[in-house]
Amino acid sequence: MAPSFTETTSTYLEAPSKAPPNLVAPEPEHCPGPESDQAGQGDACAGCPNQSICASAPKGPDPDIPLITARLASVRHKILVLSGKGGVGKSTFSSLLAHGFASNPDSTVGIMDTDICGPSIPKMMGVESETIHISNAGWSPVWVSDNLGVMSVQFMLPNRDDAVIWRGPKKNGLIKQFLKDVDWGEMDYLIVDTPPGTSDEHLSVNSLLKESGVDGAVVVTTPQEVSLLDVRKEIDFCRKAGIRILGLVENMSGFVCPSCDHESKIFRATTGGGKRLAKKMGIPFLGAVPLDPRVGMACDYGESFVENFPDSPASLAIKQVVRAVGRFVGEDPDSVLPDAE
């Protein structure tokens, strides 16, 4: 249930997503969480005063999953954006992907920021100062335009510079609220921006979305081997978790001069880059997106780079990635972006 108009957001965020067991002592540092399947059974549970309480807590299927499935039934495609390493431009790419899909006025797009401790999507989308609105239907996304909506923990913080210092169970609880209580309405694409790595948030999103039918994941890398090393682990995670990999995108593949559009290689692909990795791992290569300093400027100002600089090599590359993703989720690429070159 969404917070009431009289209840402060900070109070609501401090509350768990559902009533936990009545613990008799604080949770230890490596506690798996009272709601975890390993509650009372993990190595960290040995000697904990709460062990018997957690072990006897109700287990079984999450009763909220049918509610999430019903809530997202009107969302046609759900796409995860993953990266094995921080700093590869995953959130920037997520915002570009959302703007790319939304450049078709016939498509309605949402972007959900599940990077709870480092939410940057609102800034990139130009809605950082907005707050969540509540109706009888649930939480309303913050709309960037008529066909592009955003949901992020950033909208719920009293101050924009406040740190979110939460352990896994509380972060997972908020992700569940985003999926269960946000009224996305009729939507063509929901893009889920995740934190780097393979953390609780990834497991939570995957388990909660499994019944509602997640289309798959787009994995983002940069050309260097230090990034590819972590991407291999991310691909392994997807396969073990049963997440379909829609394809790999190589971000920052070169530098585009904004004056002459000449492309120079800044980060050298010492081991073949994303394209070679995709071939070796047996996954589609969706494309290479070059660096353009105007991308950072557009994100700082919360504007659409794709719309403002449509002829940039980076914009053209993003459009091709959008068409490729559309094709892999079962759409006609020509209907996804009719005017893409």
UniProtKB/Swiss-Prot annotation:
Pfam families documented for this protein: ParA
Location of region: Disordered: 1-44
Binding site residues for [4Fe-4S] cluster 2: 257, 260
Binding positions ([4Fe-4S] cluster 1): 31, 45, 48, 54
Protein localization: Cytoplasm
Cofactor detail note: Binds 4 [4Fe-4S] clusters per heterotetramer. Contains two stable clusters in the N-termini of nbp35 and two labile, bridging clusters between subunits of the nbp35-cfd1 heterotetramer.
Superkingdom in the source lineage: Eukaryota
Gene Ontology terms, MF aspect: 4 iron, 4 sulfur cluster binding; ATP binding; ATP-dependent FeS chaperone activity; iron-sulfur cluster binding; metal ion binding
GO terms for biological process, alphabetical: iron-sulfur cluster assembly
Protein name: Cytosolic Fe-S cluster assembly factor nbp35
Native organism taxonomy: Eukaryota, Fungi, Dikarya, Ascomycota, Pezizomycotina
